[in-house]
């Protein structure tokens, strides 16, 4: 239970940052205050969450075996694993676990905690478990394949040979965060391995520990004094729920916030012109996408799917809503990765869409319910599509709200959002968008966007994706990805990509070392303040 002193402190912080916008006040020099939209933050269990804002929190509460520096995103570096070796057959990875690391509880971190954490991720079987399950790990085999041989040694064996980089990159994802197994043993309820407890608490070894979180209001994290890399300069990090872009803009202009996220392009432009903040645009490896449920008779028609590609105003959105948030891209491999293409053959063409709808037998159009994430810029993109679809005779009943659960359960007609892949490798996107080994409802492959969309991906595409993941020859792998890009584009996919994701944030000029991360692992312990 929190002490009386901390509760008083938390209340004081909450009151201070809720001050009227008209009062200009700099944030304390040893505190970082971030404005976020918490509406999609549902919990902080790293083996359960799959959400942008939550991931940044987890990146600082926990640590992982491997580190991917923001400026060297494709180069795995030592984290909790100070070194590793790979067997000649490419199937056995042996990690030497760093000594002298302690959890926030004071418990020493050992290979046993790593073993328990990675097994827990797989056994939970939730969406983030895809990061390990895709390599053949399952609840049935994980105990024999991932094991601690002593306090400082972890052995991980893969059932098959994969490109080694894929395994290492997976172990850098926030989903593979290492938890304090001894501490959580006392917090478990009904064999949940601490799942309920971790919704609002932490059991990590990261540079910050969680002190308070009130959903859709306030989150406070405090520097961990015994952090193995040294106590962070920012004594406290505060996340405040400010869903409105205009409110975020006013507060960062006034100096009441250090970092603002989820700002509209209009507000970002104004802040950039003001000179007191810098706009960070961090390239991501995900997309803004439109999902058409293939269990729906109308939407499963290839010509209908193709028609939707002509109802997106790629160029108009690029210069307005998406100016800071995305780069036009209609192919499936993100720019900057092997096999990426600059080909963008589609443009807004209402007449072409009408022609395709007529050929499909829907000359008079149809009506569908359209779920869209109610945040910037996703909702503005959805409104644009709704308006263009109406011109082609399609009535879209646009509904905001938190519909991600319905999407996971295939209980939707049309859904749009943005994805953010955690591995800087083409396979991360392709595994989700272009593989679906079992399209049955009871398969519950919820980590795959293709399964959620009930899309039975053409076998040719799935076979190539699998072959590329196994391929160890770089040139051959690149050739496969280039071919996949072409075939996917020509398949009238149920998952339509329109923009490669870019994450835009406004950061005040006196804040140094706050660096956006392409795989959602932005760190706070690198932050300092000063002119």
Tell me what each language-model feature is.
Residues 33, 110-117, 151-157, 161, ...:
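Alpha-helical secondary-structure segments
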Residues 56, 214, 218, 311-340, ...:
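Detector for C-terminal structural segments
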Residues 70, 170-232, 236, 350-351, ...:
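Gly/Pro-rich hinge or "lid" segments in bacterial periplasmic/extracellular proteins
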